Regions:
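Intrinsically disordered, low-complexity terminal regions
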Residues: 1-314
Length: 314
C-alpha cells in the first residue's frame, strides 16, 4: 500500500467571507487526487458533515476532487484527508484532529471511479450520498442525510437516518433502510427490502422480481406497483396508515390481508369460503386466491385501509 500523491495543490480560501455559507464553511481548502486502479477494484470513502458523490466512468483510474472546511483556519488545517491506494483499492477518509471532536468542520468528496469498481464502504454523516452508473455492489451509509442511487448493476445496501432513500434502476437486490425519511424505489430487479418509520414507502417495479419484496414502515403509507404478475412473495406492513397494491390484470397470487379500524377493498375477485361477494370486497380480513393462486401476498395495517387495485399504471 502506498500513499497517493496529491495531483493538485490545496487551494486556500482562508479568511474569505461567504454570504451563503454557515460558520463551518468559512475556511476552505480544495484537494484533487488521481491514480490508476484495476477495473474491478474496491472503493472506501468516509467523511463527516459533508456529501459524497460517486459516478462510474469508462477509465481505469480514480479521480477525486473535494473540499475540506471549518469554522476556523486552525481547525481546517488540522482536519486531514487521508488517502491510500494500491492497484486493487482506493481509500479516502476525512480525519478529525484527535483533540477536537465537536468543532464545526467537515469535508465533501466528488469521485469518478471505474464503472465496475465495488463501493465497499461509502459513509458520511450530516450529508447526502449520491451514486450513479456503477456496475458492481454498493454499500452506502449516512446519518441525517439522504441517499440517492441510480443505475447500479449489483446489490445495493443503503442505510441512513432522518433522510430519504431513493433507488432507481438497480440490477440486483436492494436493501433500503432509514428512519423518519421516505423511501422511493423504481425498477429493482432483485429482492427489495425497504424499511422506515414515520414516513412513506413507494415502489414501482416494471418487472416483478422472482425474489421476495418486503416493505415495512410505521405511521406511513405504502404504495407498491407491479408492472407484471408477481413471481416472488410480497410482504407490506404499516401502522396508522394505508396500503395500496397495484397489480396487472393477469396477476395470480395467494392474498392474505388484515387491518383493524380500516377496511379492505379489492378490484380482483378473491376466491375464499364463507363470505358474500360484497363482504369479500369490504372487510377487515381477506385470505384467498387471486386467479389461480401463486406467490403469497401479505398486507397488514392498523388504523388504515388496504386497497388492491387492478392496473399497474406503468
Amino acid at each position: 500500500m502506498r500513499t497517493a500523491l496529491v495531483v493538485a495543490a490545496a487551494i486556500s480560501l482562508a479568511g474569505c467571507e461567504f454570504g451563503d455559507l454557515g460558520p463551518s464553511d468559512r475556511y476552505q481548502s480544495d484537494f484533487h487526487y488521481t491514480f490508476e486502479m484495476q477495473p474491478t477494484g474496491r472503493i472506501d470513502a468516509e467523511s463527516f458533515n459533508g456529501s459524497i458523490e460517486i459516478s462510474g466512468w469508462d477509465q481505469n483510474k480514480v479521480e477525486i476532487t473535494g473540499t475540506k472546511y471549518a469554522s476556523t483556519e486552525a481547525l481546517r488545517d488540522a482536519l486531514k484527508i487521508d488517502v491510500h491506494n494500491t492497484p486493487e483499492m482506493v481509500e479516502i477518509r476525512a480525519v478529525r484532529p484527535s483533540y477536537e471532536r465537536t468543532g464545526n468542520m467537515g469535508a465533501r468528496f466528488t469521485m469518478h471511479v471505474p464503472r465496475k469498481a465495488m463501493l465497499d464502504r461509502i459513509t458520511t454523516s450530516n450529508g447526502p450520498v449520491k451514486v450513479r452508473d456503477v456496475g458492481s455492489a454498493a454499500h452506502l451509509k449516512s446519518s441525517n442525510g439522504p441517499i440517492d442511487v441510480t443505475n447500479v448493476s449489483g446489490d445495493v445496501d443503503a442505510h441512513t437516518s432522518n433522510g430519504s432513500v431513493e433507488a432507481d434502476t438497480i440490477r440486483g437486490a436492494a436493501t433500503l433502510k432509514t428512519s423518519n425519511g421516505r423511501i422511493h424505489a423504481e425498477d429493482v430487479s432483485g429482492a427489495l427490502e425497504a424499511e422506515t418509520s414515520n414516513n412513506s414507502i413507494t415502489a414501482r417495479l416494471d418487472t416483478a422480481p422472482a425474489a421476495t419484496t418486503k416493505l415495512v414502515t410505521s405511521n406511513g403509507s405504502i404504495d407498491l406497483t407491479l408492472g407484471s404478475a408477481p413471481k416472488g412473495d410480497i410482504r407490506a406492513e404499516t401502522r396508522n396508515n394505508s396500503i395500496k397494491l397495484h397489480l396487472p390484470a393477469d396477476a395470480a397470487a395467494h392474498l392474505v390481508a388484515d387491518t383493524s379500524n380500516g377496511s379492505i377493498s379489492s378490484d380482483f375477485s378473491v376466491a375464499s369460503r364463507g363470505d358474500s361477494d360484497e363482504e369479500k370486497k369490504h372487510r377487515k380480513h381477506m385470505d384467498g386466491l387471486i386467479g389461480a393462486g401463486g406467490p403469497t401476498i401479505e398486507l397488514s395495517t392498523s388504523n388504515g385501509s388496504i386497497h388492491i387495485l387492478k392496473g399497474s399504471g406503468i
